[in-house]
Amino acid sequence: MQPIFPHFLYGGDYNPDQWLDRPDILERDIQLMKEARINCVSVGIFSWARLEPEEGVYELDWLEAIIDNLYKNGIYTVLATPSGARPLWMAHKYPEVLRVNHTLTRNRPGRRHNHCYTSPIYREKVRQMDLKLAERFGHHPGVILWHLSNELGGQCFCPLCQEAFRNWLKEKYKTLDALNAAWWTDFWSHRYTDWSQIEAPVPTGEMETHGLSLDWNRFVTHQTVDFARMERDTVKSVNPAIPVTTNHGESYEGINYYKFRDVVDIASWDSYPLWGKDPDDVRVGQETAFAHDVIRSMKKAPFLMMESSPSATNWQEVSRLRQPGIHMLASMQALAHGSDSVQYFQWRQGRGASEKFHGAVVDHYGGSDTRVFREVSELGDRLAHLDAIVDSCPKPEAAILYDWENGWAMNNAQGPRNIGMGYLQTVMAHHASFWKRGIPTDIVDMESGLTGYKLIVAPMVYLLRADFAKKLREFCASGGTVLGTYWTGVVNDTDLCYLGPTPGNGLAELFGLRKEEIDSLYDGQYNKLLPKENTLPKPEYRLKELCELIRCSTALPLAEYGSDFYAGSPALTVNTFGKGKAYYLAARGEQELLDDLTDRLIKEAGLTPALDAALPYGVTATVRFHETSAFVFVQNFNPHPLTLPLNRPYEDLETGRTLSQLPLKKFEVRILKATR
């Protein structure tokens, strides 16, 4: 789609509904926004009680005055639907809109995210509210994007959701016999004989039927996505030209975000890294890069960073201030990974309630002569000169598999490591190896296409769907390189174990081996991986937590275990499959092993780094492409300066100078331009 704006969106959550009795503050907001070069704000996210103070009584004039005044001053509006928190009158008149928690107790009114996505009454009230907003503002020239609800998520166990779950299961399985077979309910004599017997998994009920828990998580995602789709259809019924987004949280495991890819026009998320927690911020930079890549990969297009803090939060365990330079670094990192915006929560600090101490562009002092406002203004000035980058996007040659349903199944599997299988952490560790080398990666799930990639890294694909197994085999046979790992191809999509050789569904043939056993080590216990000659640069690597015992058929062993009763058996293999190669890492190593193995894979697959230079610790590079240009973001996460020799000349996008070496200040990001 066409970019919604010719500039990077710059602004944040604006809550004028909290200041309607202070017109002087609303007027001052406009002055300060101009001073900081704000061009866009998100309005109305939690304004429902002001928009509909009584049932059926809509008061939108104040909102129109706000949007008109913003537009008159060159500031555009991302207009939110206020379904993230409903007014108290609704909860008291219609208790069914409130969630029932996992103890099967209905919540009291209060908080936010305390509503049932299934409730027909809530859906109708949301639809009516959204339609009023769309009819009033759907053709307003200042409204450029719809912001659906806020940080969708959570579960409800009310009777309405239970019945909707049963209907969802009927649609999926058709018969109870099929459901019982898929869930293996003869175990413990839990066979269902009537649909009404099925209940959502709760601690006081059924929790060990793994297919039930897996399908419940799928259903929760389905209801949440369906709710968002209802909101999208409502606002677009008036003007389908205005795109929609909904803001996600970071790596929230309760909802499969990728199911939103066909609902929203633009993916977005809220970024709140724990800057300052470690001795340096390199690990935080790696983890944040992964989160950016997850959201960008949802649509494989530019995304929006809808929220971030310009200083501290107030809801994390410790509210550390961003050190000087970190604000610019964090904001430019978002752009580096494909964001077309830097948005804050919040524009102005409120005077009361739970986020009164959350960081904001304008604090309780209310002036522009603060460190935070100065840094925000500096970023605004910089963004105003980077229009050439807008709507460009990374085009990675490598992809890493992260699949929500696989994670749900693995975390509920009861073995082999009940103190934590570490699925997400393992995926992020593989991602970090590429990040440190300046190799861009997409994050894909099992529904994603694999066309266009040279390398697929698929860690711990415990739940292996048949269609993905087929795609992976075809990818490798056509010349692609694949890395698989331990605990792959164990169960099917209803969490039933594969019979016969595993990895199942043809992956035993792809990797040229079969798994026999898996050893789970206690914390503090280790094994060794001993590479064969010319395989990896070090003579040994430490292994921990999970060690799989495999038997090779056509695979060539590249390394073996160094201790325990399985010493000498294969720990790393490669198999030629069609025109490609399939590597298999049978044990969990530390980052050093993944880094060195990644170097081999990068060379084998012929991946192109974002920057033609050797990257030292704490420095990475990412690249965004237009048709004829490449914009390379070189990011220094170190608290000290350094100079980076370049293997070829680059143009500094912001100065126009040609560089053969690149000086970097601490926490600095510089943007280089190259011709494709």
What kind of feature is each model-predicted range?
Residues 10-20, 46-61, 108-127, 149-156, ...:
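The substrate-binding groove and active-site-proximal loops of carbohydrate-active enzymes
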Residues 1-25, 30-40:
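An acidic-aromatic substrate-binding cleft motif
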Residues 195-198, 261, 272-676:
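Carbohydrate-binding surfaces of carbohydrate-active enzymes
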Residues 27-105, 230-238, 462-463:
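Aromatic-lined substrate-binding rim segments of carbohydrate-active enzymes
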Residues 91, 100-290:
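Polysaccharide-binding and catalytic clefts of secreted carbohydrate-active enzymes
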Residues 19-35, 126-132, 249-260, 323-331, ...:
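Short, acidic/polar
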Residues 12, 33, 41, 70, ...:
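Conserved, mostly hydrophobic/aromatic
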Residues 6-10, 37-39, 71-77, 139-144, ...:
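Short, well-ordered coil/turn segments that N-cap beta-strands
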